[in-house]
Regions:
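Charged alpha-helical initiation segments
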Residues: 1-24
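Alpha-helix boundary/N-cap detector
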Residues: 2, 6, 28, 72-75, ...
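Generic structural signal for well-ordered, non-membrane alpha-helices
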Residues: 5-13, 31, 35-39, 75-86, ...
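Secondary-structure edge/capping motif, primarily at the C-terminal ends of alpha-helices
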Residues: 14-22, 43, 47, 87-91
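Short, mixed-charge, low-aromatic patches
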Residues: 15-19, 35-40, 56-67
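Short, hydrophobic, well-ordered secondary-structure elements
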Residues: 23-45
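Long, charged low-complexity segments
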Residues: 48-114
Length: 114
């Protein structure tokens, strides 16, 4: 199992309640899924992003992914990364994402690398 697949599995365990995190479980699972997506993106971009300064941001890697591997994959990855980021960085005046919402996002991560 790759590291990013392990992160997704752990996110699913958090959402299933196998890891007791209480009310922070949805945000924690979203963070784990976003980390998995970013690890996958780091692997995909390793050939063209290594050794340079400054290290490319996730947004710039997502843009380059579209140019190098096609708009469909890149747009799916961009939308998913943005949605996971919103789930992780919600504001005090917003409702926390529900387990159902985060589970839907987590399930969309593995198809990116399959």
């Amino acid at each position: 199992m790759t590291d990013h697949a392990g992160l997704v599995d752990y996110a699913e365990q958090v959402l299933d309640g196998k890891v007791a995190l209480g009310s922070s479980a949805p945000r924690t699972a979203a963070l784990l899924a976003r980390c998995a997506l970013e690890e996958w993106l780091d692997e995909r971009s390793a050939s063209w992003s290594s050794g340079g300064y400054p290290y490319p941001s996730t947004v710039s890697k997502l843009i380059a992914l579209g140019a190098l591997e096609g708009d469909e994959l890149a747009s799916r990855a961009r939308r998913l990364w943005s949605a996971l980021s919103r789930a992780v960085h919600h504001h005090a005046y917003e409702l926390q994402p529900s387990i159902t919402e985060v589970r839907h996002l987590v399930k969309q991560v593995p198809p990116l690398w399959r």
